[in-house]
Amino acid sequence: MKIHDILFGSKQKSILKTIEEGNLDELKIFLKNVGDVNEKYDNKSLLHLAIDNCQNNYFGVIELLINNGADINSYQSYLKETPLHRICARAKPKIDVVGLLLDRGAKVNAEDISSKTPVFHCSFNYSVELLNLLVKYGADIKHTDKYNNTLLHDDYLNCNTETFEDFVKVLISLGFNINSKNNEGHTPLYLCQNKDIEDILIKYDGKIS
C-alpha cells in the first residue's frame, strides 16, 4: 500500500488493511499523519480493530497503538465491549497482550451492555491461564450480569471438556458457587446442553435446581 493511499484513500478500508496485515511501518505513518488514534471506524476503535483482525505482529501493533494514546478502556458503541472484553473472547487468547492491556490500566471489571465483565468471556476458551491472570489483576469471579447469570451460565456447545474441568476446579478453589441461580432460578447445570459438561458439573456437586 502506498503512503498516499494510507493518508488519502478510503480511510476505513486502508487502515483496516494495514492493521490486518500487521504492517508496523504503514501504521506508524498513519498515526503520525492522521491524528486521532481514538477515532471510530464502524463503531470500533483502532485498538478494537487490531484485537479482532490483526494477522501479523499482533503484540507490536497493539503496543504501538497504546503507545500512541489509544484508549485502553474505550467502548464499542453497540455492545459496550472494551478491548479487554474482545481479547478475552478469542478462542486462543493472546496472554501476552492481555497482560499488556492490564499493565497499562485496562479495567478488569469493566461491564458491557449486559453487565458482563471480561472474565465472562473466558467461556470462549476456558483458559485457566487467562482466568488466573485476570484474577491476579482483581477480576471478580462472582460477578453476575444484569440477568444474574454467572460466568458458568452458558450453553457449552463448543466446549473442550478437559479444559472446562480444569477451569471449574480453579473456580471452586477460589470460592465460586457452581450452583448459583440466575433471575429465572436456573443453575448452570439446568441450562447445560452438553452431556460431557453435565457430567463434569455433577462430578463437582452441580445441581439442577
Task: Describe these PLM feature segments.
Residues 28-36, 63-71, 99-107, 132-140, ...:
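Ankyrin repeat domain, specifically the short helix-to-loop turn at the C-terminus of the second helix
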Residues 8-15, 39-52, 75-88, 111-117, ...:
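Ankyrin-repeat boundary/"N-cap" motif
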Residues 37, 53, 57, 72, ...:
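Alpha-solenoid repeat scaffolds
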Residues 1-33, 38-55, 59, 63, ...:
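Intrinsically disordered, low-complexity regulatory segments in ankyrin-centric signaling systems
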Residues 1-14, 137, 167, 174, ...:
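Ankyrin-repeat-protein effector appendages
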Residues 111-147:
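Eukaryotic tandem repeat interaction scaffolds
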Residues 17-22, 49-58, 86-94, 121-127, ...:
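Ankyrin repeat A-helix N-terminal signature
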